[in-house]
């Protein structure tokens, strides 16, 4: 618990923001280790605290034919190797209460997927690991819902919680990001994270050659959403990064190219350093007098 509290306080105090980044899913041990090295080198160079992210199982896929990953047992072994080899904290997601104990032995941050952000039993099981809990806001939820989700973590005895904006459904096959949510989600009284890659998904918006659909996305707009988020003053940036996005087995259209990671982060840091987004403006409504 002491190590968890230390990491949580370090992330809360990070200036101008902290980074949760990595490939969407574990494709192989070799690929994950290589990506962890590159992303750590870049984050160290630009001066951002990094928590490395990847998933062991993509349980919520559009198609049953979609790649899911190596599974929990093998995936956690690989993430443990990343943790040891590069001295990096780890964030990964859970989908069932039964996974939380095992995941909590490896992950420093347990992530609750957006579609599961209201699942009380899952939130409580994750909280009881004592690890930091990152709750993604459901695409169907108002930002105020995250106050309740965060409170479920605290009532389970765990004060180490953060909430994450990842877009809102806008009709079929599309998401939008409402920048007001970055401000309103602060009412959860915890760090606010912006997922700048999943926010550009187009769910089930890509037709496959063999029939069926998969998630598409608008990768070219990732910088737009990222600039907005850091200007508003979010505490953390979540992003998925890949060295070959066109060949990525999952969410390729919304993974940011590794070759452009340093360039984007440098720009975001520059924006974050000049904005006063983390300082709430006190509005004086008394009558103006000369």
Swiss-Prot record:
UniProt cross-references to SUPFAM superfamilies, sorted A to Z: Aldolase (SSF51569)
Thermal dependence of function as given in the entry: Optimum temperature is 65 degrees Celsius.
InterPro entries the UniProt entry points to: Aldolase_TIM, DAHP1/KDSA, KDO8P_synthase
Example GO molecular function: 3-deoxy-8-phosphooctulonate synthase activity
List of residues that carry N-acetylalanine: 2
Primary location recorded for the protein, binned into one broad class: cytoplasm
One Gene Ontology cellular component annotation held by this UniProt entry: cytoplasm
Superkingdom in the source lineage: Eukaryota
Reported pH dependence: Optimum pH is 6.5-9.5.
GO annotation terms (biological process): monosaccharide biosynthetic process; pollen tube development; pollen tube growth; rhamnogalacturonan II biosynthetic process
Reactions performed catalytically: D-arabinose 5-phosphate + phosphoenolpyruvate + H2O = 3-deoxy-alpha-D-manno-2-octulosonate-8-phosphate + phosphate
E.C. no: 2.5.1.55
Location in the cell: Cytoplasm
Tissues expressing this chain: Expressed in shoots.
Keywords: Acetylation, Cell wall biogenesis/degradation, Cytoplasm, Transferase
Gene3D superfamilies in the cross-refs: Aldolase class I (3.20.20.70)
Free-text function comment from the UniProt entry: Catalyzes the stereospecific condensation of D-arabinose 5-phosphate and phosphoenolpyruvate to form 3-deoxy-D-manno-octulosonate 8-phosphate (KDO-8-phosphate) and inorganic phosphate. Involved in the biosynthesis of 3-deoxy-D-manno-octulosonate (KDO) which is an indispensable component of rhamnogalacturonan II (RG-II), a structurally complex pectic polysaccharide of the primary cell wall. RG-II is essential for the cell wall integrity of rapidly growing tissues and pollen tube growth and elongation.
Family the entry assigns: Belongs to the KdsA family.
Name of the protein in question: 2-dehydro-3-deoxyphosphooctonate aldolase 1
Gene: KDSA1
């Amino acid at each position: 618990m002491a190590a968890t509290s230390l990491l949580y306080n370090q992330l809360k105090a990070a200036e101008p923001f902290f980074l949760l980044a990595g490939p969407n899913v574990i494709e192989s041990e070799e690929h994950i280790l290589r990506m962890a090295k590159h992303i750590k080198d870049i984050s160290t160079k630009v001066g951002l605290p990094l928590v490395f992210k990847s998933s062991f199982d993509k349980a919520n896929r559009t198609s049953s034919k979609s790649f899911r990953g190596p599974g929990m047992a093998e995936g956690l072994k690989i993430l443990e190797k990343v943790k040891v080899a590069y001295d990096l904290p780890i964030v990964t997601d859970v989908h069932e209460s039964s996974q939380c104990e095992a995941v909590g032995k490896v992950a420093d941050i347990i992530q609750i997927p957006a579609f599961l952000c209201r699942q009380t039993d899952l939130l409580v099981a994750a909280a009881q690991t004592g690890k930091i809990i990152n709750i993604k806001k459901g695409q169907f939820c108002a930002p105020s819902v995250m106050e309740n989700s965060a409170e479920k973590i605290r009532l389970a005895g765990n004060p180490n919680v953060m909430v994450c904006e990842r877009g809102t459904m806008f009709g079929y096959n599309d998401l939008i990001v409402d920048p007001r949510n970055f401000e309103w989600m602060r009412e959860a009284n915890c760090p606010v994270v912006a997922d700048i890659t999943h926010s550009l998904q187009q769910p089930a918006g890509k037709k496959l050659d063999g029939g069926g659909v998969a998630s598409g996305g608008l990768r070219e707009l990732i910088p737009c959403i990222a600039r907005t988020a850091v200007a508003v003053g979010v505490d953390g940036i979540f992003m998925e990064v890949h060295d070959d996005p066109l060949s990525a087995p999952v969410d390729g259209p919304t993974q940011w190219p590794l070759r452009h990671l340093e360039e984007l982060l440098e720009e975001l840091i520059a924006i974050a350093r000049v904005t006063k987004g983390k300082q709430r403006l006190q509005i004086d409504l008394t009558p103006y007098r000369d």
